């Protein structure tokens, strides 16, 4: 006769894998060399923190982008978005994008934070902040960083609709103007 080890009677909820457990967040990665700050979090995003991280006496321009949850998608009422990620890969991809942008545009700072879990209507799911010596480089860098994050980073979005339906989507199914990309033009 074999005995089974005693089961923990105090927990009836199965434990989540660490990458899905909000209590293991925020996950961050930084680079002092290029003043890069990256974060994946289940908490509300704070644009003031983003600007504090990218602030530099050598910067004449600071660009801040907030991506927020819309209330409709293709005519369907959206109740909320939900994001998931595999943090080790996502942070590595974010660092690659941020480092490349810092070097290409001579940035003084880069901050990227992406929210995971449920993101209600009107709340931010992504914050991108960059600082540069001049506005032209900052504008270009901010847009390029955002588009590369949407195209390359291991973060997936589930749109949840008021009618009860839901759809998983890649972050990069549409261009900056909202036009649908074909599978050969973009996406993972």
UniProtKB/Swiss-Prot annotation:
Catalytic activity, EC: 2.8.1.12
Region (Disordered): 1-23
EC top class, as a word: transferase
Residues that hold substrate according to the record: 134-135, 150, 157-159
An example Gene Ontology molecular-function term: molybdopterin synthase activity
Pathway: Cofactor biosynthesis; molybdopterin biosynthesis
Compartments reported by the entry: Cytoplasm
Description of how the protein assembles with itself and partners: Heterotetramer; composed of 2 small (MOCS2A) and 2 large (MOCS2B) subunits.
Protein family membership: Belongs to the MoaE family. MOCS2B subfamily.
UniProt name for this protein: Molybdopterin synthase catalytic subunit
Biological source species: Neosartorya fischeri (strain ATCC 1020 / DSM 3700 / CBS 544.65 / FGSC A1164 / JCM 1740 / NRRL 181 / WB 181)
Source organism phylogeny: Eukaryota, Fungi, Dikarya, Ascomycota, Pezizomycotina
Gene (name only): cnxH
């Amino acid at each position: 006769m074999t005995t089974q080890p005693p089961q923990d009677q105090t927990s009836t909820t199965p434990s989540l894998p660490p990458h899905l457990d909000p209590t293991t967040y925020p996950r961050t990665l930084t680079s002092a060399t290029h003043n890069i700050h990256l974060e994946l979090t289940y908490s509300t995003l704070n644009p003031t923190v983003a600007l504090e991280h990218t602030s530099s006496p050598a910067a004449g321009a600071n660009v801040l982008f907030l991506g927020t949850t819309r209330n409709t998608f293709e005519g369907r009422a959206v109740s909320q978005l939900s994001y998931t990620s595999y943090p080790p890969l996502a942070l590595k991809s974010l660092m690659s994008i941020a480092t490349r942008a810092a070097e290409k545009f001579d940035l003084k700072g880069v901050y990227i934070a992406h929210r995971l879990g449920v993101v209600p209507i009107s709340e931010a799911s992504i914050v991108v902040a960059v600082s540069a010596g001049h506005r032209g480089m900052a504008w270009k860098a901010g847009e390029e960083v955002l588009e590369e994050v949407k195209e390359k980073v291991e973060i997936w979005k589930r749109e949840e609709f008021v009618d009860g339906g839901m759809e998983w989507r890649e972050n990069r199914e549409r261009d900056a103007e909202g036009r649908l990309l074909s599978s050969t033009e973009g996406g993972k």
